[in-house]
């Protein structure tokens, strides 16, 4: 007999046999054991993807998902406040939950040091962002209203949105992780409208987990957590890339010259006026920010200080060029905000 969990999964989960790829960032997948796994970024191995187990079945676990007990790998409660577990500990937690994955890892590319490689064969299904949004809007009037009002504010078609987070698998929480699916130019325009709205309405600003989140905002009585996705996979800059490390631990200051792709994982920004700590200069280059918490953090005109890795970046469309890579939140600070 099917329980509530099974019935809701029938509504939201799409069989993995229907998955055509490529693996898009911020997509939830369900492992055969019932764990919820979140994909990270766009550059993935053939037949696998980089991601993290977020919630996993655990008898006696403190999270109720439609009548089944779960726990999570990335958060801990300290003195009554939720805190994010450091990245290295999150990675180790993956192997505590699924020790068989350790043998599958192999050598990781530098951008994936905080993620785990999962074979697609380990999954029963995935949660499509658009499909989940349609189901939620049909079933919950308040979600439909929030989506319509938010899209009206941002001058966007609500049918070109999706959801991620727990909403992707039908679990209702207080916030809406709304995904905007457009061209880089369209998504950039939405982000600028959000920034202008927050600047004009300071009460809409969001402070969580010890920081301000520049793209999150309160609207229509709800916390809106925007995510952005490329509508066309051909517009993804690093869908297929190769990275070779040249120098590590290089301290520089630079000015952001191009923020077209700063909304995604990875966030990619063009840098100019680069100065090493010793005073020597560098030519203009791209900075690849491979950390989901840093989406939308830096913008054109910002002067930033970064502790980075110099790499050779190779892509089919642009060949090989020098670039910079960071993967941790503490690897950059904003010296001067534009």
Feature annotation, model-predicted:
Residues 2-174, 181-338:
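Catalytic core of pol beta-like nucleotidyltransferases
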